[in-house]
Amino acid sequence: MVTTHNLGFPRIGAKRELKFGLERYWKGESSRDELKALGAELRRRHWHDQRDLDLAPLGDFAFYDQVLDMSFTLGNLPKRVQDFHGDALDNYFRVARGRSAQSAEEHAACCGGVAAGEMTKWFDTNYHYIVPEFHADTNFSLDPSRLLQQLAEANAQGVNAKPVILGPVTYLWLGKAKDVSDRLALLPKLLPVYGALLDTLTAQGVEWVQIDEPILVTELDAEWRQAFRTAYAALETRRIKLLLATYFGQLQDNLTLAASLPVDGLHIDAINARDEVDALVRELPAERVLSVGAINGRNIWKTDLNAALDWLEPLAKQLGDRLWLAPSCSLLHVPVDLASEEKLDAEIRSWLAFALQKLDELKVLATALNEGRDKVADALAANAAAIDSRRRSPRVNNPVVKAAIARIDAQLGNRASPYTQRASKQSARLNLPAFPTTTIGSFPQTAEIRQARSRFRAGALDEAGYRTAMRAEIERSVREQESLELDVLVHGEAERNDMVEYFGEQLDGYAFSQFGWVQSYGSRCVKPPILFGDISRPKAMTVEWIAYAQSLTRKPMKGMLTGPVTILNWSFVRDDQPRAVSCYQLALAIREEVLDLEKAGVRVIQIDEAALREGLPLRRAQWSEYLKWAVESFRITANGVQDDTQIHTHMCYSEFNDIIASIADMDADVITIETSRSDMELLDAFDTFKYPNEIGPGVYDIHSPNIPTQDHIVGLMKKAAERIPAERLWVNPDCGLKTRQWAEVIPALTNMVAAAKTLRNQVQ
């Protein structure tokens, strides 16, 4: 009999209950006990949703991040919070998001509070984790309370639970040494704590533990491979059964290593690594379980169940009880329940599967394998009809768009003149001071903005009333910026709910969900649009709003657009054509908007590519192909403008050392990047690579409520000036200010502008 299980379930709740609960707690509107009760209720509900599984995950729920949870389980707290006492949950949030100075005790780090932990992308997804911090003298100590509490809850609910933990080698690999020490040197101190954790779970009657080691799908050198052998040899003596889980890619040169590790089962992502299944069957010891991730855990399209059974049935005959079935990865990356989508186009809806529907698909596959296809004939027939409907739909294919793609040539992405010539023309037109100040685009999405949008979408506010409300918010943003004496202004994006969804709503080839939320980090959720067909732009999308904002000020007003690569990487993308083709389609559509903004007199146009790095394949050998079409797509979008129009781009959560040449090849006049959490470490790339254009290193962390001091910002910019000529530096926050409050934004920007004025006097 095939065993079904799941690697992880979305933790935010079908209606984002966790998000709202966290925000109430952070604002002091609810108690710690109320937040903990909400977590328990969500876990209870999610285990109920997974009741048909043979094994349900435990420990996949986190109040902020599963990697941060593992750091606390291992007793690895950053030194700056180790002296704080009180409830562990407050320390947890100190690490996750920082804390504004509320007492003399907390006035400890930069910005008048506790510096938040560094945050970066979880592999090639749009989820973010808090980076573990290591020092040569780091020690570990077990705190199993979180897992034991959840295990008690699961037992009380009658759940056959499988605890999920991050493996020791991946944990070290994901972290960062805060000194010159080697992370792997900590492995001997870390392994006994893992062993103690497994012993603790064994004593509680746990049979299986899922231990995630996703770095096995990346390129590992000999030292890291040996770390796997060392780690699992040390854990082999435990009486508990280990399911080693890999996902997000192929094992390739790590396949033999993974198959040889002394564990009881191995999970493989059969969406990305289906071709490796046969090799694993040959290499795995005869008694070992092979868990096959046959349902895509990262996209929302229905699985072709009949096609899946065609290759799973021979495998089931060969492996028998050793075959387990699961999604390819945790379902954290997809929305919770398609049944909530009452307004989604019925035809498109029939092509989709969210987390609960993916578990239904898993059940159909297992039933067919265990009892025969006849037992689920109706479900298989309905699935086949949906797959065929999508394949044949004329809504998916647009001959006009395909013809435009065929006409793309090498000249389409080139500016008329090189940067040095453009810069002099832009300087004459814009007349900016040294260290010009700007923001990244968005200002706080206030309760009034959200209420107006909600009433407009519900039909309680007509279009004229909505436009009046948004214009008032834009005017407020402009007046605040002028009062702050910023140099290049933005309109604040009051009319935009999300930087990708806003554009997707206005492009043909996109569809939108009501409740298709996924977690990005902490309480931050995104609702990716659904790219189901060929992309085109029926009409201008932003010109009216930007032109209105420009009419309110003599200062330059940035046109704000999301770039094609980011729109692609932050969407649920069709899987019936190469991603590069969809990206080129987006590039042509956004290019039309860029040219319309220029015609409207907009002098500065920002094209955000926040997610450029996120699309990089996990293996470097595949980077060049991705970067070629990603950079070309940006250039097609941006480079049709005149020399005196200044093109900005923004990137966040990015490390630049290894892709700096490609970023330079984008040829944006100004690039703004996130650097504050890494204390300008990202600028190390510029020690050896002479970046030719202008750059704005982010000077304060917008993900934290902490207010940066003027001196702190001056210090960061002086570090930047050691690498980048001062005449090519801009001063700006790390990212957009959408998630902050005006009460935080005003003092932070006041200090930022004051710092820029100080720099103009100090740095020649």
UniProtKB/Swiss-Prot annotation:
L-homocysteine binds at residues 440-442, 493, 608. The active site is at 703 (proton donor). Binds 1 zinc ion per subunit. Pathway: Amino-acid biosynthesis; L-methionine biosynthesis via de novo pathway; L-methionine from L-homocysteine (MetE route): step 1/1. One of its GO terms (biological process) is methionine biosynthetic process. It holds the Pfam family Meth_synt_2. GO terms for molecular function: 5-methyltetrahydropteroyltriglutamate-homocysteine S-methyltransferase activity; zinc ion binding. Its EC number is 2.1.1.14. Transmembrane segments: none annotated. It is an enzyme of class 2 (transferase). Zn(2+) binds at residues 650, 652, 674, 735. L-methionine binds at residues 440-442, 493, 608. Keywords: Amino-acid biosynthesis, Metal-binding, Methionine biosynthesis, Methyltransferase, Repeat, Transferase, Zinc. 5-methyltetrahydropteroyltri-L-glutamate binds at residues 16-19, 121, 524-525, 570, 614. Its cofactor is Zn(2+). This is 5-methyltetrahydropteroyltriglutamate--homocysteine methyltransferase. It comes from Burkholderia cenocepacia (strain HI2424). The lineage of its organism: Bacteria, Pseudomonadati, Pseudomonadota, Betaproteobacteria, Burkholderiales. The gene is metE.
